[in-house]
A protein has these predicted regions:
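Gly/Gly-Pro-rich "capping" loops immediately C-terminal to redox-active cysteine motifs
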Residues: 50-52, 70-96
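Positively charged n-region of N-terminal signal peptides that target proteins for export
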Residues: 1-4
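Electrostatic cytochrome c docking/interface patches
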Residues: 26-56
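Axial heme c-ligation environment in periplasmic c-type cytochrome domains
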Residues: 21-25, 81-84, 102-133
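Sequence context surrounding c-type heme c attachment/ligation sites in exported
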Residues: 51-58, 93-97, 107, 118
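Bacterial N-terminal signal peptides
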Residues: 10-16
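Sequence/structural segment immediately N-terminal to covalent heme-attachment motifs in c-type
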Residues: 47-70, 76, 104-105
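Short glycine/proline- and charge-enriched loop/turn segments
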Residues: 34-40, 78-85, 107
Length: 133
């Protein structure tokens, strides 16, 4: 009887510890090819581009990345990976080409938007809008 109680309590303790394990697993860095990193954004960041980028971001990105790009959208908590925070230096220090590549190609929970948004200029407009966070 005492052995069964000890096993039961050990099991409960182990389950309780799971509550402290972070949901989002650490991610390996994106492997962005040099050619993609060095690609220049052909879409000027002007009012028209930003309006287009915002509309597309709201349609395709906001549910995970959040209204202000902090990675806190309503779907973010259901993902196995971290959405990232577009307001932090780690994001802001990336090239436009890197952001375009990541948005286009995706990985794991991040969809490859080149399939959903086939016009590359629209993805560049999203990059321009992401730069406003």
């Amino acid at each position: 009887m005492k052995k069964n109680l000890t096993l039961f309590m050990s099991g409960l303790f182990a389950i309780g510890l799971l509550a402290f394990v972070p949901k989002n697993s650490p991610q390996e860095p994106w492997k962005v090819p040099d050619a993609a990193k060095n690609k220049a954004n052909p879409v000027k960041s002007d009012a028209e581009s930003l309006a287009n980028g915002k509309a597309l971001y709201n349609q395709h990105c906001k549910s995970c990345h959040g209204t202000k790009g902090k990675g806190d959208g309503p779907k973010a908590s259901t993902l196995d990976t971290d959405c990232g925070d577009f307001t932090k230096p780690a994001f802001k220090n990336q090239t436009d080409g890197s952001l375009f590549y990541k948005t286009s190609e995706g990985r794991k929970d991040m969809p490859a938007y080149k399939k959903k948004i086939p016009d590359a200029n629209d993805i560049w407009a999203i990059v321009n809008y992401m730069r406003t966070f």
